[in-house]
Amino acid sequence: MQDASEPVINMPALPMNSVNEQHDRHEDLPEVGTTSVTKIINDSDNEDDENGMDLGRVASESLEGDAVVSIDINTEDSSLSPAKQENEKSPEGIEQKYQEEDLKDDKKSNETIATPVPDAASRASLEKQKSGLTNLEKSTHVVLIKCIEQLIQIKVCMKNEKMKNLMEQLKPLLQTECQFDKFLIVELFQYCFESSQDEVMNISLDTISKLASFAYFSSKDKTPASFGPPKSLLQCMVDMVCDSINDEVVDGNLQLNVVKALSAFILCSEQDSMLHGAILLNSVRKLFNVFLLGDSDTIQSVAQASLTQAVTVVYERLRASHTQSNSTSALPEEDASVTENWVHDEDEPDKKITLHSMASAGTSSLDHVKVDADDPAVTSVENSSIQDAFLVFRSMCRLAVRQTSPDKVSNIRSQAMRAKLISLHLIYRILEKNSDLFMDPTLQFRGIPALKGMTLVHASRQYICLVLSRNAVSPVPQVFEVCCDIFYLMVFSLRAHFKQEIEVFFREVYFPMLDLKNTSYNQKLHTLLIIQRICLNPRALVELYINYDCDRSSTTNVFEQLLFSISKVTTNGPSETISEDIEEILPSLESSERSSTPFLNTNSASLKSEVVQLTTFSDFQLKLKTLQCVLDILQSLSNWAESGLYLSRRGVSTDEQGFVGDYDALSRSDTPVTNPYYNGKQSFEANSHSSSSIALADPSQFESNKQRKKLLRTCINKFNYKPTRGLKMLSENEYVDINDPKAIAEFLFRADGIDKTTLGDYLGEGDEKSISVMHEFIDCLSFINLKFVDALRRLLQCFRLPGEAQKIDRIMLKFSERYMKENPSAFANADTAYILAYSIILLNTDLHSPRIKNKMTKEDFIKNNRGINDGADLDEDYLGFVYDDILKNEIAMKDDQELAAIAPLMNNFSTSSGFTTFTSNGRDLQRVACIQASEEMANKATSVLKKLLYQQKHGSQKTNVYYNATHFEHIGPMLEATWMPILAALSNPLQNSDYVNELNMCLDGFQLVVRIACLFDLDLIRDAFIKTLTNFTNLHSTSEIKLRNTMVIKTLLRIASTEGNNLKDSWKDILTIISQLERVQLIGVGVDETEVPDVINARVRRKNVNIGSSNSIRHVSGSTSRSTRTRSLSKPLSPEAVSELMSTEVVLSIDRIFTQTSSLSGSAIVSFFKALCEVSWDEITSSSDLEQPRLYSLQKLVEISYYNMQRIRVEWSSIWNVLGRFFNMVGSDENRHVAVFALDSLRQLSMHFLEIEELSLFSFQKEFLKPFEYVMASDTVVEVKELVLQCVKQMIQAKISKIKSGWKTLFGVFTFAAKARSEILISMTFDTLVNLFSEHYDTLMQQNCLIDMLISFTELCKNGTNQKISLQSLEIIREVYSSLSTMIKEGLSSKPSVNETFSKYVFPVLFAYYDIIMSAEDLEVRSRALQNLFYIFLEESDDFTEETWEVVSRKFIFPIFSIFGPEADEATVMLRDEEIRTWQSTTLVEALRSLVTLLTRRFDKLHNLLKGYLWLFSNCICRDNITLSRIGTNCMQQLLSGNAYRFEVKDWNLVADMFIELFKETTPHQLLLLETFSNGQGAPVYSENENTQLSHKRGGSLPETSRSISTSSISPEKQMEFRSMIRKCILQLLLISIVAELLDNEEVFNHIPHEHVLKITVAIYDSWQFARKFNEDKSLRITLLNVGFMKQLPNLLRQETASALLYITLLFRLLKTRDPLGKTETDQKIHKLLFPVCAEMLDMYASLVVEKHTRNHAAWQPVIATILDSILNLPLELFSENIHTLYFSCCSMIAKENLDDQLRELLKNYFNRVGHILLNLNAQQE
C-alpha cells in the first residue's frame, strides 16, 4: 500500500512542443496481440463466479514471486523453457503469455457466457438472422441479460426504483431481440455506478468490458440533450469507468475490473469504437493511476502490463494505418509555420532555466494543440493514429520530467519515482519498437495546424531532449540506467536527427560521468554498457567521427574524447585485490540490451534498495568493461575497414553499395535497425523544420576539415599562451584578418576554447590595436532593454576582468558608451554608467572576497554613489536594489560556478565514493552535495540545449548537415586520432595483471590495432604497439617470465603470421623476439646463459643507449645492467615458462612465419629480409667474443632464401640488394666461423641460382656473386680469401656453361686476389686465370670478358710479391694481343669499323700496359711493359689512323708523364718522392727516349699532336729535378734537331709560344711586391749601418758577422710561397740555358723563322729587365733578408747576365744571317732592339766600382766582351752606322780602373777601327 500523503499523479492533456525534423524509416516491427490482458481478467472473473477464486489470481501468479504458470503452447511442448519462464516475469512476457492463452481460453469463456464471442473479423462476416440481429448482437443481449439478472438479485439495485424499472423495461426487449435505444444501457450503468456498491460496480464493469470487446459502444452514437453536454456513448462509458474509482484506497477487485474494462476499450479494433484523443489519454491516465495506487502488487503488475499494452496498441494502429495509406498517399508539402517557444529568449540569459521549469511553466504553440473537427484530414484513420501516438508520447515525457524532491529520490518505491520509472520505460519502449515510424518522412501531421507537415521525430524532438537532460544524471540507478538506454536509441536510431543534441549529451553528461572521480560505480558501469553497445556499431562510430571530430562547427571531438574518457577508467583509480571467483563477475558485466520492462510494483525486486548502488563491483570490474569497450571499438573499426577494402578490391564503389552490410544490426536483441535510407535511397533533403540534412562522406573532405580544425585548436592554444602570436598564427592560416579589428573581435566573441582570462588581459591592453578590438568586441553584445547590472553580468561572462585598474578603466568606458547608446534614457550621461559600473565591480569584490572582513554596507554603497548622475543622485531604492542583487548573486563566471557546483563529484570523499550513502539514514551532507552537483549538471545540459534550440529556431546557425558513413578510408584517421589513449588502456593491464581473460582482451586489442595500422600504412602506430608488446615479453630477463609474457609472445607470433605483408620496419622487433625466444629455449634445455648472449642487452651496451631518452623505446625492455644479468643467472627459468615457450604451438608458429615468407608481397619480403639481416648481425656482434657465435638468424636467412628463390627477378633483385650487402658484412667478418658459414651458404645459394637460365644483357648473376668480390677486397684473413677462391673455382668447374654476367664479378674476385700480398692467393689466382686462358679462351671472348681478364692479369703484373708470376702474366698479355692482332687482321676482310675494332680489342691491351708502366712494383716488369707498349706503337701501328693516334696519345702516352702535370700537386710529389725518383731514374728516361723515337718515326700522323708533346717536354724541363731537366732538354733538342726540317711555320710558332709562356709562368713577380713579405714576425732586423753596408754590395755575400736566421717562426704558408719564388728563379735560368743550347744548333737555327726568334728574344729581354730591376732594388732585397727569405742577401745576378748575354748573342746572329744593308721591317726592328741595349750595357759596366761590385764586375765581363767582339765583327757599313751610338759608351770604358786585358784589347781594336774609318772618311773628304 502507498503512503496516502503522496499525491496522485493525474495526467491532464499536457501541452507539448515540437522541433520539426526528418529522418528515414526503419523496418516495420511485428504486431503484438492486443487482447491478452482483458482476456485473462475475463477468465479470472469466470473462474471466480464458478469456483469462488479471488479476482486477479491468475495475473498475480503470473506476475509476481517465483510462481510461474506453465502454459501449453502446442501439443509438442507442454511447458515453458527457462528462457520463456524468465520472459514471463516482465509485462512483455505477460502479454505474450496472454496471447498464447487466448486461443485456449476462448472456448471456456464462451461456455460460461453461453454465447460465443467471435473476433472482429468473424463478426464482420456473420449473417443476419430472421429477427434482423446478427450473432454479435445476440451475444451482447445474452451478456446484458445475464448482467440484469445478477443485478436483480442484489437488494440495493431493487431498492432503486428508477433502476428497477429500467431493468424491467430492458429485460423483455433483450429477450425478444427487439431493437432499442442503447442509451438505456448507459443509463443503467450510470445507476449502477451511482450506487457505490462494489458488488454492483464489479458486475457492471465486467459487463462493460465484455460489451467493449464486442465494440458495442460507438463514437457515432450521441447522448441525448437531457443527459448534459452532447458526447458520444463511447466517451460517456469511458468516463463512467474512469470515474468509478477515485484515487483513494479501494477494493482490489474493483481496480482489476476497471483495468479490464479500460483495456477492452483501448484494445477494441473496430474503427467506430476506437479510443482517440482525450478519451484515450483519460483511459491511459486511469491505468497509470491504478499502477501507482493498486491495492496489491498483482494489481499494479496487471495495470503496468495493460498500460504497456495500451501504448503498444496505439503505435501498432499507427503502423497499420500508415501501411495501408502509404501506397496511395503522396508526401505532402511541409509547412514551415511552426514556431517554438520552448526556449526562452536570449535577452534573459542569466535566468536559471531548467527543463523542469520549462515543462511546468513554459508555454508554446504546441501546448494548446487544437484539432479542427471540420478538417477532413482529421477524421482519417492515419491522422487520428499519429495524433494519438504523439499525445501518448508527450504525456509520458511530461510525466518523466516532473521534479522529484531529494527525499523522494532516496525512496525508490515512492509514487513519484515509480511514475518516473514507468514513464521512462514506456518512452524507451516506444522509441525502441517504433523508431522507424518516428523517422518516416511520409508519416506527417495533417489535421493539426501547429503540427502540419511535421514528422513524429520533429514533434517529439524537444521532449526527448527534455527527458534526457532532466534524468540523465539522476543518482537513482534505475532512472540512470533507462536514460542510458534512451540515449543509446538516440545515437543508434535517431542520430541523424539529433546531431547537435548528441554532442551536448556526450559533452555535458556522459563524458563527465566517466571523467569525474566520484560518480557512482553504477553510473560509470551503465555509461560503459551503453558506450559498449555504441561501440559495436561500426557505422555509428565512423559517423561520430566524421560528424563531430571532422566538423569545424563542433566544439567536441566526440569519438576522440570517447576513447580518452574510457581509457581514463583503466588508468585511474586504486588497484583492488581480485577475488578468486572473478570468473563469475564477467557474465553480470556483459552488455545486454533491454529486452523487457522490469516490474515496477511497490514490492518489486527491481526496486530493492540494495541495488541502488552496485557496491559489489570495484574499479577492477569497471576496468574490465572499459577494456571490452575499447576492444569492441577496435573490432568495429577493423570490420568496417576490411569490408570496405574487400569491396574496393572487387571494384565495387562503397557509395553505390551503401556500404551497410550488417553493421547497423549491432544489437543482439530484436531492436529494430534504423537505416538512414528509406527504400534504399536517401529519403529526404533538408527543409525548414530540419536542423540537419543527410549527405555522404567524402574522405578527402573530412581529412581537410579535421586538419583545419586541429590547426584552429593549435592557433587558439597559441592565443591562450601569447595573444599576439596567436593572432598572427590565425592570420597566417586565414582564420582571421589581422588588420581588421572587427573581424578579430567577432572571432574572439564566437570561438570556443578561448581562455577568458587571457582574453580579458588582451582586451584591456593599451595599444591602439587592442583597444580597437575591445571596442568591436563589446559592440558585438546587445544591451537593449537590459537592466544595468544584468548588462554588466552579460559583459563579464564573455571574459574575465583583468586585475589592472587601467585595463578595467578602458573596458568600463567602452561598456558605458555601448550601454547608453542602446539605452539612452537609463542615465543622464555615459559618465554615470561608467562610475556606477566601476562602483559595482568594487562592491562585488568587497562583498564576496574572503580576505575582506569589513564588508561594505548598503548605506556606504549609496553614499559612495551620490551625485554621479550629472550632479544629481540616483534613486536610493535603485541603488539599494543593485546592492541586494550583488549581495545575493555574485558577479562571477558561470564556468567557475559550474565547477564549484560539481566539485563534490570531482574531489575524493573521506567516506565511500559516489552516492553509496543513499542507503543510509538521514540527510547526509555528502549525499545532498552530490544531488546538487547532479542537478547542476542537468541545468548546464539544459542551458546548452536551450541555446542550441534557440539558434535552430532563429536560424542563427547554418543548416547542420549530417553525413552518412560510406567509406572505409575514415578508419585510418580515426585510429591516428585515438591511438594514444587506446595504447594506454591496453598497456596498463599487461604490466601487472595475471587475469587471463583481461590479458586476452588486451592482446586482442593490440592485434586489432596492428591490423588496422597495417591496412592503412600507419607506421608510427604500428611500430608503437609492436614495440610495446616486445617490451612486455620480458625475454631479456628469463627468470621473470610469467604467463602474461608468454601470452604476449604468442600474440606477436600471430601478428607476424597474419599481418606479414604490412609490418615493414616492425619485422625487426618481431624477429628480435624470435631470436630471443630461441635463446630462451636453449637456456631451457640446459645451455649456459653466457654462451647465448641476449641481442638486446648486447645492443644496448654497444650503443650506450640512454634508457631515459625518448628515442629508446626499442631498448627499454633490454636495458638491464651487467649486475642484473649476473643475478638472473642464479635464477633458473621456471618450468611453466619453459613448457609454454617450447610448446608445439610456439614452435609451429615460428616455423610458419619463415615458411610463409614465400607468400609475402614483393615489398614485404624485402622488409623481412632487411629485418632478419639486422637481427642476424646483432646476434653475431653480441657473440663475437665467443668461439661459436650465434648463427640462428643467419641460418634462417639462408633457409628463407631457398624458399624465395623462385620469385620473379624484379622482386629477387630487391631482395638481393639487402641480402647481398649483408653477405658482404658476414663474409668479411673477423670471426672465421661466421665468415666460413656465410661463404659456404653463399656458394650453395649461388650453385642453385646459377641453375636459373639468364638471358643476355642481364646482370642478375653479376649482382648475386658480388659478395665474393667484396670479401676478397676486404681486410679479412687469408684463410677466408682462400675459401672464396675455392668457392669460385668450384662454381667455374661445375657451372661454367651457365655463367654469363657473373664472369665480370668472378674476374673481380681474381683482380682483388691478384692485389693480395699472399703468395698462396697469388699463385691460386694465377693458376685459375691461366687455366681459363688456355682452356676457355673462346668462351670468355664470347662472353666479352677480354677487359676483365686483362685487368686480372694486369694486377698480377703490378703485384711485386712474385716477379716470376708478374712476368708470366705480362707474357700472357702479349699473347693476348698477338691473338687479338691476328683476329683483327682476319676480321678486316669484312671491313668492320676501325675505331670499333681498336676500342674493343687494342685499347684494353694498351691500357693494361699503361697501367703496368705506371703502377707496377717491379722495375723489370715496368720496363718490359714499356717496351711492349712502344713496340706496338712502333711496329704494330701501321693501321693506326690520325684519330687513333690522338686517342692513344691522350689516353696512354700523355698520362705516363701526368705526374709532371699541373694536377700533380706538391703534396703528392712529396709523398711519392722516393717512388718518383725511382721512376725518373728508370722508366721515365726510357719512356722519353722511346717517345722521341716514336715522334720521329710517326711524325706524319702525330704532327697534329705536336702541341701536346711539346707541353709534355716543357713540363719535364720545368721540374725542379736536375736529372729530369737534362733529360727533357736532351729529348727536346733531339726532337727539334732531328725533325727541324719537318717543322712548318705553325709548328715553330708553337715552339716559340711554348718558350714565351714558360718565361711568363716562371717569372716570380711576387718578389717585387712588398706586401708579399708583410708578415715578418720573428725575422731579424738589421741596423741602419748594416743596411748601409749591405747596400753597397749589390750582389755580394753577407757581412763578416754572419747571422744564422731561423725560419721556425715563419708560417708554413710563407715558407711554401718563398720556395715557389725560388723555384721560379731557378727555372728562369734553366729556360735561358735551354734556349741558348737549342738555338746554338745550326740545324734548328737555320729552320726556325727569324720572326719567331725575335719573339723568343723579347721574352729573354723581359727576363733580363726583371732581374735587373730586382737587383737594383736594395731595400727590397734587404727586406727579403729580414723576413728570412734567404740566409744571405738575395740577388738575380746570374739571370741578369745570362739573359743579357743570350739576348745580344741572338740578335747579333740574326744580323749575320740577314742582309747587312737590308732595310726591311725586321732589320729595322733588330737594330732598335740591339744597339741601344748594347750601349746601355757598356755604360752600366763602366759605372761599376770594382772594389764594391767585384762579383758583378766579373759576371758582366763576358757579356761586355761579347758585345765588343760582335761589334768589331760587324760589316763596315753597319759598324759605321752605329759609331755614334756606341762610341761614347766605349770611351767611358777607357777610364775604368782595373780593366781586364781582354776588354782592353777589344776596346783598342774598336777604337782602331773607328779611327781607320774616320781617317779614311777624312781622307776621302779631303
From Swiss-Prot:
What cellular-component terms does GO give this entry? COPI-coated vesicle membrane; ER to Golgi transport vesicle membrane; Golgi cis cisterna; Golgi trans cisterna
Record's compositionally biased regions (Basic and acidic residues): 85-110
Q: What does this protein do?
A: Guanine exchange factor that acts as an activator of arf1 at the trans-Golgi net-work and is thus involved in vesicular budding and traffic between compartments of the Golgi apparatus. Activation of Arf (ADP-ribosylation factor) GTPases is essential for vesicle formation via recruitment of cargo adapters and coat proteins necessary for Golgi trafficking. Involved in the resistance to tamoxifen (TAM), an anticancer drug used to treat estrogen receptor (ER)-positive breast cancer.
Q: Where in the cell is it found?
A: Cytoplasm; Golgi apparatus; Golgi apparatus, trans-Golgi network; Cytoplasmic vesicle, COPI-coated vesicle membrane
The short sequence motif called HUS box sits at 547-551
Q: Where is this region: HDS1 domain?
A: 898-1106
- Its recorded name reads ADP-ribosylation factor guanine nucleotide-exchange factor sec72
Principal place where this protein is found? cytoplasm
Q: Compositional bias of type Low complexity: which residue ranges?
A: 1117-1130, 1597-1610
Q: What happens when the gene is disrupted?
A: Sensitizes cells to tamoxifen (TAM).
Q: Does the keyword rRNA processing apply?
A: no
Organism, as annotated: Schizosaccharomyces pombe (strain 972 / ATCC 24843) (Fission yeast)
Q: Where is the composition biased (Polar residues)?
A: 72-84
Region of interest (Disordered), residue spans: 1-54, 66-126, 1111-1131, 1584-1610
